[in-house]
UniProtKB/Swiss-Prot annotation:
The modification N6-acetyllysine is found at K28, K50, K51. The cell attachment site mediates the interaction with ITGAV/ITGB3 and ITGA5/ITGB1 integrins, leading to vascular cell migration and invasion. This interaction also provides endothelial cells with the adhesion signal they require to grow in response to mitogens. Residues 22-37 are annotated as: Cysteine-rich. The modification Asymmetric dimethylarginine is found at R52, R53. The keyword Zinc applies. This is Protein Tat. Residues 1-48 are annotated as: Transactivation. GO terms for cellular component: extracellular region; host cell cytoplasm; host cell nucleolus. Residues 48-58 have a biased composition (Basic residues). Residues 49-86 are annotated as: Interaction with the host capping enzyme RNGTT. The record marks W11 as: Essential for Tat translocation through the endosomal membrane. It comes from Human immunodeficiency virus type 1 group M subtype H (isolate VI991) (HIV-1).
Length: 86
């Protein structure tokens, strides 16, 4: 292991920063890209603000789909389903 310059900050030590930038890919290689990627992607730990998800309102065309279906009366047959015998 190479000696580390004590006058240099730890985040500037050689090998402390990955050569490539972090991305949004969740493959195994990208999950182990750096410590931050491992925490965020591999373990699912996010520090910071949580984005507030807005509920999607139903479009008017979907709200009216219940009124388009006519209600059919239920046929209540008792006895022989072939019809009344005389």
């Amino acid at each position: 292991m190479d000696p580390v310059d004590p006058n240099q900050e730890p985040w500037n030590h050689p090998g402390s920063q990955p050569r490539t930038a972090c991305n949004n890919c969740y493959c195994k290689k990208c999950c182990y890209h750096c410590q931050l990627c491992f925490l965020k992607k591999g373990l699912g730990i996010y520090y910071g603000r949580k984005k507030r998800r807005q509920r999607r309102g139903t479009p008017k065309s979907l709200q009216d789909h219940q009124t388009l279906i006519p209600k059919q009366p239920l046929s209540r047959t008792s006895g022989d389903p072939t019809g009344p015998e005389k």
